[in-house]
């Protein structure tokens, strides 16, 4: 009996790539989805300079590199760079030979057909994978929460989607996309701090800003009330030190910044907040399934990690929905990685093994096979 080969699961987000082995409960590798190329050839004499760097190494050398994010708003826009990220994932992060393992990739909701074909082609032709599957990110998050019906509000670094799912199938006509996510919030905070006279030039400083965001921000249950409270006392204020010794004091920004998720006008965007977008998505679905969706609103992605977000979502959705509706918000503690976890669960199910698209099927039918096998 030959040893069962573990499938590889790769969740390519706009901000971070999560990769690991099916059956594991967390990704082995999590690194920034960036590719950097030297701005000037031969600056670093004798460094054995590479023509490109990926992930953390690109981040740490960003001073001499031009950085690109090959995934914008969840969709791959630069295939050469994307290939570099996958290469880095297999050979440097996971240290595996891709031709020996089935590969499960994730895709954004409403990913264009040509993109799915291109992914399929690269996996089979460039990396010689024996088998391949591509799954919609939000559907995997729903599986990770132990459900097959519900609506997923998935908010990452580059994009936010609301995806209603019925019996394991995403309902494309009701999926909504909001181009407001983690990176916009980080950039806004940096802008605020620059206006207050702090400087953010180095990567280390940008990382600190992300740290402030992740450790100090929270969502207010009642925004107006919170502003009043913050104005009357300094209890909410927190201080943190930058690498160069400057001390930043953060007060009502702690909840004012993430408030933009519910009031995008704060960032100058004419868009519905995440609560309204979720409501609009549900409203586009058949009457018969709305009750099931309201009762299973699953939060997913790093930008849903703020304390207080689930309670606020509960309050806002309840006030939008019909009075007889029971609204339940599900916010699993590991939701930062729930897309990856769902992929790990799916790819290790015995019932899933005959659903892989094999190299042989690809050779017979070409990239279009992906639409018949993965839906």
UniProtKB/Swiss-Prot annotation:
Q: What is its main location?
A: cytoplasm
Q: What class of enzyme is it?
A: hydrolase
User: Which keywords does this Swiss-Prot/TrEMBL entry list?
Assistant: ATP-binding, Cytoplasm, Cytoskeleton, Hydrolase, Nucleotide-binding
List, alphabetically, the InterPro entries matched: Actin (IPR004000), Actin/actin-like_CS (IPR020902), Actin_CS (IPR004001), ATPase_NBD (IPR043129)
One Gene Ontology MF term: ATP binding
Give the source's domain of life in one word.
Answer: Eukaryota
Q: Where in the cell is it found?
A: Cytoplasm, Cytoskeleton
Asked whether the keyword ATP-binding is assigned, the reply is yes
Q: Name one GO cellular component term.
A: cytoplasm
Q: EC number(s) in its UniProt entry?
A: 3.6.4.-
Q: Which Pfam family, just one, is annotated for this protein?
A: Actin
According to UniProt, the reaction catalysed is: ATP + H2O = ADP + phosphate + H(+)
Cite the SUPFAM superfamilies for this sequence.
Actin-like ATPase domain
Query: Has UniProt tagged this entry with the keyword Cytoplasm?
Result: yes
Described purpose of this protein according to its UniProt entry: Actins are highly conserved proteins that are involved in various types of cell motility and are ubiquitously expressed in all eukaryotic cells.
Family membership:
Belongs to the actin family.
This chain belongs to which protein, by name? Actin-1
Q: Which organism is it from?
A: Suillus bovinus
Q: What is the lineage of its organism?
A: Eukaryota, Fungi, Dikarya, Basidiomycota, Agaricomycotina
Q: Which gene encodes it?
A: ACT1
């Amino acid at each position: 009996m030959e040893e069962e080969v573990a499938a590889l699961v790769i969740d390519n987000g706009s901000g971070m790539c999560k990769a690991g082995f099916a059956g594991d409960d967390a990704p082995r590798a999590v690194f920034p989805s960036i590719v950097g190329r030297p701005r000037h050839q031969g600056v670093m004499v004798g460094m054995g300079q590479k023509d490109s760097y990926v992930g953390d190494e690109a981040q740490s050398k960003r001073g001499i590199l031009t950085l690109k994010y090959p995934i914008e708003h969840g969709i791959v826009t630069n295939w050469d760079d994307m290939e570099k990220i996958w290469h880095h994932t297999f050979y440097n992060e996971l240290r595996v030979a891709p031709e020996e393992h089935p590969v499960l990739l994730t895709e954004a909701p409403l990913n264009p057909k040509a993109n799915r074909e291109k992914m399929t082609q690269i996996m089979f032709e460039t990396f010689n994978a024996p088998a391949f599957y591509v799954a919609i990110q939000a559907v995997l998050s729903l599986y990770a929460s132990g459900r097959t019906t519900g609506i997923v509000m998935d908010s990452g670094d580059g994009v936010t989607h609301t995806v209603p799912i019925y019996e394991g199938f995403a309902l494309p006509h009701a999926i909504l996309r909001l181009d407001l996510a983690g990176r916009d919030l980080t950039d806004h905070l940096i802008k605020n701090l620059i206006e207050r006279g702090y400087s953010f030039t180095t990567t280390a400083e940008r990382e600190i800003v992300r740290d402030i965001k992740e450790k100090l921000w929270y969502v207010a249950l009642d925004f107006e009330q919170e502003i009043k409270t913050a104005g009357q006392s300094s209890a909410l204020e927190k201080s943190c030190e930058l690498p160069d010794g400057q001390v930043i004091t953060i007060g009502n920004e702690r909840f004012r910044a993430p408030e933009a998720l519910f009031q995008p006008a704060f960032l100058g965007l004419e868009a519905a907040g995440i609560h309204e977008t979720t409501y609009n998505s549900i409203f586009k679905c058949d009457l018969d399934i709305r009750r099931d969706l309201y009762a299973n609103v699953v939060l997913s992605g790093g930008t849903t990690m703020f304390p207080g977000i689930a309670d606020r979502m509960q309050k806002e959705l309840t006030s939008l929905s019909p009075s007889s509706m029971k609204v339940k918000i599900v916010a699993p503690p590991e939701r930062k990685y729930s897309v990856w976890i769902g992929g790990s669960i799916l790819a290790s199910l015995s019932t899933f093994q005959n659903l892989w698209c094999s190299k042989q099927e690809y050779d017979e039918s070409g990239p279009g096979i992906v639409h018949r096998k993965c839906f």
